Each structure stands twice: as C-alpha cells, then as structure tokens.
From Swiss-Prot:
The gene is hisB. Its main location: cytoplasm. Belongs to the imidazoleglycerol-phosphate dehydratase family. It holds the Pfam family IGPD. It catalyses: D-erythro-1-(imidazol-4-yl)glycerol 3-phosphate = 3-(imidazol-4-yl)-2-oxopropyl phosphate + H2O. Pathway: Amino-acid biosynthesis; L-histidine biosynthesis; L-histidine from 5-phospho-alpha-D-ribose 1-diphosphate: step 6/9. The lineage of its organism: Bacteria, Pseudomonadati, Pseudomonadota, Alphaproteobacteria, Rhodobacterales. Gene3D superfamilies: Imidazole glycerol phosphate dehydratase, domain 1. It comes from Cereibacter sphaeroides (strain ATCC 17023 / DSM 158 / JCM 6121 / CCUG 31486 / LMG 2827 / NBRC 12203 / NCIMB 8253 / ATH 2.4.1.) (Rhodobacter sphaeroides). One of its GO terms (molecular function) is imidazoleglycerol-phosphate dehydratase activity. It comes from the Bacteria. This is Imidazoleglycerol-phosphate dehydratase. Its EC number is 4.2.1.19. It is found in: Cytoplasm. PROSITE patterns: IGP_DEHYDRATASE_1, IGP_DEHYDRATASE_2. InterPro entries: IGPD_sf (IPR038494), ImidazoleglycerolP_deHydtase (IPR000807), ImidazoleglycerP_deHydtase_CS (IPR020565), Ribosomal_Su5_D2-typ_SF (IPR020568).
Length: 195
C-alpha cells in the first residue's frame, strides 16, 4: 500500500497529513488559508493522489509558517509513501495552459532535493495571499520530498492563473512520476540500485 500519514507539531503549526498515491484525487484540505486550500485541492485532484490535510497555524502573524510547513509535511508524507521507489516511473513533466498562463513543470523523484524556479508574478498578492508563498511551498515540498523540481512560466499576466497553472503542472508531473511502471515493476529506477 502506497500510503502514509505524517504528524508534525512545532511552536508555529500543528499539521496532520495523509496521502494515498493510488487514490483518485480525493481531497479534504483545511489550513485556514483559503487560496492555499484551493491550490492544494488542485494538487490532489490533478495528481490523482488522495490528500487529507489539517493545519492549525499562527495565522495571526501571517500565512508563511502554515504554507511552508504544509509543504514540509506533504514532502515527508510523499517520501514515506514512496518507500524505496521500486517500480515507479520516477520522472514527470507537463505543460499546463490556463487561460493566459502557460507553465512547464518537470521533476525527478531522485532523492536529491533541488528547486529551479522561474515563475515571476505580476502582483505581490492574490487577494490577501502573498504570491511569494507559492515558491516557499514548492521549496519545502522539494526539499522534504527529495524532489528535483523545475517550474517555469512561459507566459502569463494573471497571478491567480499563474499560481493555479503551477500547482496543476506540478500535480500532473507528480502523477506521472509516482505511477507504477509495468515494464519495471520490481526495479529501482536508477543504475545505482537505489534512490
């Protein structure tokens, strides 16, 4: 079973997350940050990963700790659910168009965390949500999920569309990478013999 549950409690956040890599994209996300919940819904739906996420954060300060720590916990849950990564495709990439926005995401579940980020936003906020937190989330996800992740904006003028296209592009890339490879069902997808 490719499932995992993570609980993470700090002075800033109290998080529980469960993932099922062989799900259907069901989600139940409650972080207290409306726009971020909407983005996480998109991530689950388009990755076909069932995600339940609860976060009690210090939102009286700002959204930063909540968003970043959810990325940390989700990355840890993905790592645990993938186990030794035997039989997965490992790589994924996707170009996602959403109205004016076109975003490319490519990733490798290599165990070597790295983020290449070329996603400038035309505004600093989407409603009350700081657009810089999109990068913070993906940095935390990549670092704690052991993911090499590239996200590039090819075109876009609307910050909401850019953010949503990024979450969906990463989701579709993740969906491809975690998918079992029927031709290599028992193999680690690396010439090193481990990831």
């Amino acid at each position: 079973m490719r499932k995992a549950e993570i609980s993470r409690k700090t002075a800033e956040t109290d998080i529980s997350v469960t993932v099922d890599l062989d799900g259907t994209g069901r989600y139940d996300i409650r972080t207290g940050v409306g726009f971020f919940d909407h983005m996480m819904d998109q991530l689950a739906r388009h990755a076909l990963i069932d995600i339940t996420l609860r976060c009690e954060g210090d939102l009286h300060i700002d959204d930063h700790h909540t968003v970043e720590d959810c990325g940390i916990a989700l990355g840890q849950a993905l790592t645990r659910a993938l186990g030794d990564k035997r039989g997965i495709r490992r790589y994924g990439s996707f170009h996602l168009a959403m109205d004016d926005a076109l975003v490319r995401a490519a990733l490798d579940l290599s165990g070597r965390p790295f983020l290449v980020w070329n996603l400038p936003f035309p505004t600093e906020k989407i409603g009350s949500f700081d657009t810089e937190l999109v990068r913070e989330f993906f940095q935390a996800l990549a670092t704690h999920g052991g993911i090499t992740l590239h996200v590039d904006l090819i075109h876009g003028v609307n910050s909401h569309h850019i953010a949503e296209a990024a979450f969906k592009a990463v989701a579709r890339s993740l969906r491809e990478a975690v998918e079992p490879d029927p031709r290599r069902a028992d193999a680690i997808p690396s010439t090193k013999g481990m990831l």
